[in-house]
Amino acid sequence: MDDMKQEFAYEKLSGASSSVNKASAFKGLKNKWLASLFLEFAIKSNVSQLVKTSRRGPLNVQKAFYPEGKDCAHVYLLHPPAGIVSGDELNIEICIQDSAHALITTPGANRFYRARTNLAIGDSKQTQISNINVLGKGICENFPLETIVYEGADAINQLDLKLSSQAHYI
C-alpha cells in the first residue's frame, strides 16, 4: 500500500493525523498475498515426474511421492497461511504433458474467511484461480480437500480446465 493510500485509510478509520499514530496503526493492517504456483509433470526415464516448478508468495508444493508406483506422481499443494482473506489472489497453473499422470491434493481444507467491509483499506475480493492443462494422453487426478466458505466471504474459486481429446481428468 503506498503512503498516500495508507494515510487516507488511517485518517478515514481513526480521524487521527499524527505520524506516530499512523505508524502504530498500520502495524495491524494486513498486506494482501499475491501468490502463484506453476507445476509441470512429464514422463522422464519412464516415470511420471514433477519436472518444473515456479512459485511466488506462500504457495508451494511438497516433493512428489509414489505410493502407487512410478506411473503416478502424487503432490500436496501447500498454502501455509491456510486461508484466503480479503485482497488475496492465488493463481495455480498445472500442466500435465503427454502420457504423464499426476494426483494433486491438499493437506487440509481451503478456507475463504469473512471479507473486510471497510474498502478504504483494500479490496474485499478473495480469489483463487486454478488453470489445469492436460495434453496428449495425460491424466490429472485433482482431489483437493473441501472448501469452507465463511459467512460474509467475497470469494472467487475458479477452475479452468483444458483437456486434449485423449486426456483424462478426475
Residue ranges and their predicted role:
Residues 1-126:
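Terminal catalytic/cofactor-binding subdomain
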Residues 162, 168-170:
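A contiguous pocket-lining binding segment that forms or flanks enzyme active sites
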